[in-house]
Amino acid sequence: MTKKVLISTGGSGGHVVPAITIYNHLKNTHETLISTDIRGLTYLDKNIKAFVINTPKLNNYFLLPFSLLKICFLTVKSFFLLKKNNISILISTGGYMSLPLCLAAKILDINIFLIEPNMVLGRANKFFLNFSRKLICYSKNLINLPSGINHKLTTINPLIRKEYYETSKYQKHDNLFTIIIIGGSQGAKIFDKLLNKSFVSLAKQASIKIIHQTSKKNINFLKNFYSQNNIESKVFSFDHNLNEVLKQGDLCITRAGASSLAELSFLNVPFIAIPLPSSKDNHQYENAKYYKEQDCCWIIDQKNFDDQKFKKFLVELTNKSQDYMTKKNNLQKLNYQNTWNNVNQKILNIINEN
């Protein structure tokens, strides 16, 4: 009899993208369902039917009693959801959104598998670690991992969306050095204001093209900025075919979400990571550090950003320095065995293990 799987996710793309990837790995061999909160729905394909469990955050002390009461209610709702659908495996991608379903799964003695795409063990995953069957991550050197838990740890290649494996190699039709900026859906001052000054100077010394992802409110500002400074550019807020955009890049400047870095790495696009300083447990820095330690990327500290040094650094990269080529070659070596079939088989082996 086929095991029924429920994947619990929600919140940001950092949680939802791995969930979608796991869903696509399992949908042909298991009856697979997804649960998310309202925010997570925006990342899901309309063809995927999702149950909504809208878990409240626990960061407001004034509303804490109400939030805890709601979580109790959602745990009961999750209990009946799991029971009604005969779920035998729960896969959680972490985050506070997973609390009700993981609690209900524990009560029902359902096998729980945790996914940790970051290099720092998340708080929700850490809380449910003792209740789980396995913790699936990308490295054995996971930060904040409690002692005596190594037997639950199992590693896989980073989860990459299927369309990335099917992405054809980009054929350049010009001599422009293409820089892609991924500022996130909310945008950020350093991506939308500070970096631009460097591009103006760089454009006087090198032939460049900028592809800039930002928030909707900043699109017109950036389009006008690049136009006024005669810099060829494309500015956008969201693109369902981001893989087709990223493959055009000679270089990417990005935050350091686990999925973003894994996808850039897989497409062999050298990147400069500017970790979000306020990320929980500094996990974005640790994500980027994983690649830097393998000489696959550069890291810039946002708090100590130096415009003059950055301009000089970009000039070196546009000339495809030895350092640039080393990063590109190392990225290729890093992803040598990351194929859809290899990851698929590893996931199936993990969840089907007796």
Residue ranges and their predicted role:
Residues Y336-N354:
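C-terminal alpha-helical cap of glycosyltransferases
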Residues N24, S35, R39-I48, Y165-C252, ...:
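Donor-nucleotide binding loops and adjacent catalytic segments primarily
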Residues T2, E31, I38-R39, L108-T167:
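Active-site-proximal region of nucleotide-activated glycan assembly enzymes
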Residues I87-I89, I231, K247-A262, V269-P270:
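Acidic donor-binding loop of glycosyltransferase active sites
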Residues W298, K303-N335, E353-N354:
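Conserved donor-nucleotide binding/catalytic region of nucleotide-linked donor-dependent transferases
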Residues I7-G10, E31-K70, K216-N218, K303:
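Conserved nucleotide-sugar phosphate-binding/catalytic loop shared by glycosyltransferases and other
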Residues M1-D37:
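N-terminal subdomain of nucleotide-sugar transferases
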Residues N60-I89, L99, I107:
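An amphipathic, basic-hydrophobic alpha-helix
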